[in-house]
Design a protein with these regions (language model features):
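Aromatic/acidic polysaccharide-binding cleft in carbohydrate-active enzymes
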Residues: 144, 366-368, 372, 413-435, ...
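The feature marks proteins involved in alpha-glucan
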Residues: 1-24, 49-138, 148-163, 167
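Conserved, mostly hydrophobic/aromatic
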Residues: 27, 141, 182, 192, ...
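Substrate-binding/active-site clefts of carbohydrate-active enzymes
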Residues: 136, 142-188, 195-318, 340-346, ...
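C-terminal beta-strand-rich structural cap/linker in extracellular carbohydrate-active enzymes
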Residues: 31, 82, 558-572
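Active-site-proximal helices and loops of the catalytic beta/alpha 8
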Residues: 226-234, 249-259, 317, 327-410, ...
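Hydrophobic faces of well-ordered beta-strands that scaffold small-molecule active sites
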Residues: 137-139, 190-192, 236-238, 324, ...
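Carbohydrate-binding surface patches
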Residues: 24-26, 510-546
Length: 572
């Protein structure tokens, strides 16, 4: 038994409430080390001689990463405080007990040697997420390039490669006019990158947080967009750029004008005067990524915190938006995010808060900051598996298992699974134009649990290299559209919505074969059992054990074969 691999903490990731009187307790162990894990629990305060409150629960393996297995027990309890410990039996028959961060050879009888779970505390800190969000489908729009309400010359609109200086006249009215496309695709949530006043096309260097950029439209246009989306059953998420501003933002302008005498000096991180931000040089004030045009805000300053929290609340009240995506969220303090969550949830309880972070985000996802994140670990694993072919299918599944094993159960169905975005090259570009690879990547994205985030144009196989070329004009003319890819996305989304088992069903089987480069995931709910088959090789593979069953993706009986870089959804 590998003692050093055993990990449990009485925190919001390994011991927490998911509902009134319903709790989750998890433990991490070495991969393939354990034959059985039993959770022992009892009431902390009721003496044994008065009442025997002991219970035992056989824990269930819920995820496997590259080096660890994760076990979980769910238990109903109605008491003041629970005491608990673990009984491990490894594959060699060795037995050990673990309580209060110590190992014991004998069963633990002293309650002071056990772990602690105070019920009220855990329930008061329970992770509450919007009821509407789990497993919904997101569509990301870059407003400057998605759709224009005015006529734009075709040569200008479809320019490739495109630069950050190209103006395609995209606007909110253009988005409104194309909502039917988004709805018909099967989208639940529309996420827009920033739309506030700025001189750039990307709008991440904001000048005025209370004004829609005139090139995009007006507050009334935004209000109409939200209303029209809501009529179609869609939610609207906007981009919150609170890590930094543009240089022309009033507070930084005041600093540039008045220097050390500016009353806004403490709104930023100024190292010395005069301010210097020569191209190619590191500015003498903190910025986003050393870009002098994006000075970093000091959100520890109560005035700054209040200003930007007020901005977030204002747009919720003014236009009834449904979520904020937090740009560069991991470079802003936990203190700010805790206060931010309380403020916006007080205005609209079912607001969705999404953080931008490119790695594991467990410390932001404990129920008191964000609801979810853009799942860049998913993106990176899709690149490694399909685009670069650097990992085998077993490692892909294990890497996703790390997230499932360590994240709160409430947020896992809300993870924004993406294969590209406005900050990356298009997936098709990373695959050197291999559409079959994007075809399979879309199947992974849309058939796994979470909130898949489709970047505008992926449904038409839009190409595009790294930023800014990944932000080309949307393919609205049929001559540019890949209709086969579009129908594939529609079919995947239709199946996902019609068969809740695909995204919400319990995973009861996972078969990965590295030599074949195939994955079979079997999910089950009260209505049906479904096998999701992914063939990551370039050659056809046989799955004769499912022959004759119905293949939802092809809408016909399964012939037992899955072509190279293809998928199947089989009703068992």
């Amino acid at each position: 038994m590998e003692y050093s691999a055993i990990y449990h903490d009485m925190d919001k990731r390994f011991c927490y409430a998911i509902d009134k009187d319903l709790f989750v307790i998890r433990v991490q162990v070495k991969k393939d080390d354990m034959k059985e894990i039993i959770l022992h629990c009892e009431d902390k305060y009721i003496p044994m001689e008065r009442k025997d409150t002991k219970k035992t629960i056989l824990m269930k393996k819920i995820a496997t990463s590259q080096f660890h297995d994760y076990y979980e027990a769910q238990l109903h309890m109605h008491l003041i405080c629970l005491r608990y410990y673990f009984e491990f039996t490894d594959t060699q028959g060795e037995k050990i007990y673990y309580g209060n961060y110590e190992f014991y050879k004998e069963c633990i009888t002293n309650r002071d040697r056990m772990f602690d779970c105070p019920q009220n505390l855990r329930e008061e800190e329970m992770f509450e997420v919007p009821d509407w969000a789990a497993n919904k489908v997101v569509y990301q729009i870059f407003p400057a390039r998605f759709a224009a309400s005015q006529q734009v010359d075709k040569e200008q609109w479809y320019k490739a490669p495109i630069s950050s200086m190209d103006d395609l006249h995209g606007d909110l009215r253009g988005i409104i006019e194309h909502l039917d496309h988004v709805q018909n695709l099967g989208i639940d949530v529309l996420y827009m990158t920033p739309i506030f006043k700025s001189y750039s096309s990307h709008k991440y260097d904001i000048i005025d947080y209370y004004q829609i950029d005139p090139s995009f439209g007006t507050t009334e246009d935004l209000r109409e967009l939200v209303q029209e989306a809501h009529k179609r059953g869609m939610k609207i998420v906007m981009d919150a750029v609170f890590n930094h501003t543009g240089r022309e933002f009033f507070a930084f302008e005041d600093i540039m004008e008045k220097g050390e005498k500016s009353k806004y000096l403490d709104w930023y991180y100024i190292e010395k005067f005069p301010l210097e931000s020569e191209r190619g040089e590191i500015p003498n004030y903190k910025c986003f990524g050393y870009y002098g045009g994006m000075p970093k805000l000091n959100l520890k300053n109560p005035e700054v915190e209040k200003f930007f929290t007020d901005v977030a609340c204002y747009w919720i009240k003014e236009c009834d938006i449904d979520g904020w995506r937090m740009d560069v969220g991991d470079e802003i303090s936990h203190y700010f995010w805790k206060n931010f969550r309380r403020a916006v949830k007080a205005v609209k309880k079912d607001m969705l808060i999404i953080g931008e972070i490119w790695h594991y985000a467990g410390d932001f996802l404990e129920g008191d900051e964000w609801d979810t994140v853009m799942n860049y670990p998913f993106y990176l694993n899709m690149i490694d598996l399909l685009a670069d072919e650097k990992i085998h299918v077993s490692q892909f599944v294990q890497n996703l298992g790390y997230l499932k094993g360590r994240l709160n159960k409430k947020c896992y169905p809300l993870m924004w699974n993406l294969i590209d975005s406005h900050d990356t090259a298009r997936f098709l570009h990373l695959c050197n134009g291999n559409k079959k690879k994007q075809h399979l990547a879309a199947a992974f994205q849309l058939l796994l649990p979470g909130m898949p985030m489709i970047y505008y144009g992926d449904e038409f196989a839009m190409p595009g290299a790294n930023d800014p070329d990944c932000r080309r004009g949307m393919y609205w003319d049929e001559e540019y559209q890949d209709k086969e890819m579009y129908e594939w996305y529609k079919q995947l989304l239709w199946i996902r919505k019609k068969h809740a088992c695909i995204s919400e069903g319990e995973l009861i089987g996972s078969i990965t074969k590295d030599e074949e480069e195939t994955i079979v995931l079997i999910r089950k709910n009260v209505e049906e059992t479904i096998a999701l088959i992914f063939n990551c090789s370039s050659n056809a593979k046989n799955f004769s054990e499912y022959e004759g069953k119905y293949n939802l993706l092809r809408d016909e009986p399964f012939d037992g074969k899955v072509e190279g870089l293809d998928a199947a959804v089989i009703v068992l």
